Amino acid sequence: MINHDLALALCGAGHGPFVDKIASRAWDALRGVADIVEASNAVESMIKETYQEFGQIYQPGSFPEAELIYGITIGGQSKLFQACGPIVLEKSYASSGIGHYLADFLAERMGANGEHGWLTTRQCVAVAAYILFQAKEHVEGCGGNSHIAVLREAESSGMVEHELVEHLTEHLKLADRFTGELLLDTADFSMSDSALAEKIESSVGL
């Protein structure tokens, strides 16, 4: 959701209708906010109020589970949050859903969890496409189309075009196969250095 210099991206896991309800209320909560602090507080308050409201309807122990990851950018500043139920925490990296273990592993391996410096926006999009591809390939229950949103502080925010996501995914599938072969080749001490270098060069050329 975008409005001038204010943008919100939100995804969720768990009880679908409840996630949709919070998502539909998130943008309304941001109306009239002036800065990132007001925006952050507004969405957090909305989440807590929604849980309080529906908590009076559901029987004890039957309340639907939902996890949210959302980002906000306004006035040249941005923040990322993760909400586990009504508990909201600010994050530099977050994952959720049944594929989050695989996502965390791949993000750490590719330096995308913020612990070893920061990636460029293009690199983050590539990592996101790769994680989604791997999750859909290897985690039961993960599927559907891949959707990637980018929030920018100095430029326009929005969704990455579906065609680009598909192109990235196909390219990463090919690169992933060759990367696996290279890992095996580097452990093959019978292969000469020149042969290994040639294999690496041909793979990079792809």
Give the label of every model feature segment.
Residues 133-140:
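Short arginine-rich
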Residues 1-64, 87-126, 140, 159-206:
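Conserved short S/T/G-enriched processing/targeting/catalytic segments and their helical context
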Residues 66-73, 79-80, 124, 144-153, ...:
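Short beta-strand scaffold segments in enzyme catalytic cores
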Residues 127-133:
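A conserved acidic, glycine/proline-rich C-terminal tail/linker
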Residues 71-97:
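A mid-sequence, solvent-exposed acidic-amphipathic segment
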